Amino acid sequence: MSTLHKHNTPQMAAITLLGLLLVASSIEIAGAESIGVCYGMLGNNLPNHWEVIQLYKSRNIGRLRLYDPNHGALQALKGSNIEVMLGLPNSDVKHIASGMEHARWWVQKNVKDFWPDVKIKYIAVGNEISPVTGTSYLTSFLTPAMVNIYKAIGEAGLGNNIKVSTSVDMTLIGNSYPPSQGSFRNDARWFVDPIVGFLRDTRAPLLVNIYPYFSYSGNPGQISLPYSLFTAPNVVVQDGSRQYRNLFDAMLDSVYAALERSGGASVGIVVSESGWPSAGAFGATYDNAATYLKNLIQHAKEGSPRKPRPIETYIFAMFDENNKNPELEKHFGLFSPNKQPKYNLNFGVSGSVETNATASLISEI
């Protein structure tokens, strides 16, 4: 005891405070870095690409999802240090699957020509392609397209930098309750299992679009609004030793369980879309959207009962997009087209601010 008291000097107190600040800073930065925002462009009144990227930077949004390799956006991203999930659109999947020469051309034109000035982290080959939706005509081409892009990325010398995956939705899940019993639909296993095997072998995550809003609005009699908005005061689902207070976690963990049942226990998940509309349909209100988004950003730092670690999550979307249909789809934006924020959201303080703060403390020690 006396030894400890002997070293309890103002200098040691300052060092201790510095350590606590650094820990707090690392937690805040980790939480902020867990969140990205999807940059959709289906509007006729949106800011230009340079303005958009400056808005990302000014709001400390460190990750961005592009749905296609728009060269104007990629040019604006140069030197921004923003990590990018780059989409290969559904319209290109069949072409890319047909031959390596097409994959090499796509990677050269849309990836290598911008690397390393643009920090491309993932290639999302296709979005929500599924044998049980209107995209079923593309299902046989998806895994071959992913393989070809993966090979082309490797040939370009970027295999250690960029992961190749695809973005799926919850229609592929056959059972999601309780979360530990999650499994893919039996009639989709022929499609899903090769994707899971590819991701396992290449150590890439599955990209999953998770929307508690659609589950709630489609079944409000059985799914409560607080459970959907992260505001339930008590445990809603007890699944063995795991307790679920929000639908987002339950949906996410059901996909983890489904991956495990398909041989993908080692495959991670990135939430490639999640959001809540502010108008346009049942349950789509400003207050609900504000509550969901604020709580999602906070919750992404914490993880789910099955995987209690930060969840890399991309919010849909940056702007309200007036060319989208149906009406509901026009109201998912975090910002209005005039760049004014719709909600008071905190994406975390920038590392430079925290570095300056800790630097001044160090100078006083």
UniProtKB/Swiss-Prot annotation:
InterPro entries listed in its UniProt record: Glyco_hydro_17, Glyco_hydro_17_plant, Glycoside_hydrolase_SF
Protein name in the entry: Glucan endo-1,3-beta-glucosidase, basic vacuolar isoform
Keywords linked to the UniProt accession: Glycoprotein, Glycosidase, Hydrolase, Plant defense, Signal, Vacuole
GO molecular function term, any single one: glucan endo-1,3-beta-D-glucosidase activity
Top EC class for this record: hydrolase
Active site annotation, chain numbering: 128 (proton donor), 273 (nucleophile)
Family: Belongs to the glycosyl hydrolase 17 family.
Subcellular location field: Vacuole
Function, as annotated: Implicated in the defense of plants against pathogens.
Cellular-component GO terms for this entry: vacuole
Domain of life: Eukaryota
Prosegment location in residue numbers: 349-365
GO annotation terms (biological process): carbohydrate metabolic process; defense response
List of glycosylated residues: 356
Leader sequence segment: 1-32
Pfam family of the protein (one): Glyco_hydro_17
Catalyses which reaction(s): Hydrolysis of (1->3)-beta-D-glucosidic linkages in (1->3)-beta-D-glucans
Entry EC number(s): 3.2.1.39
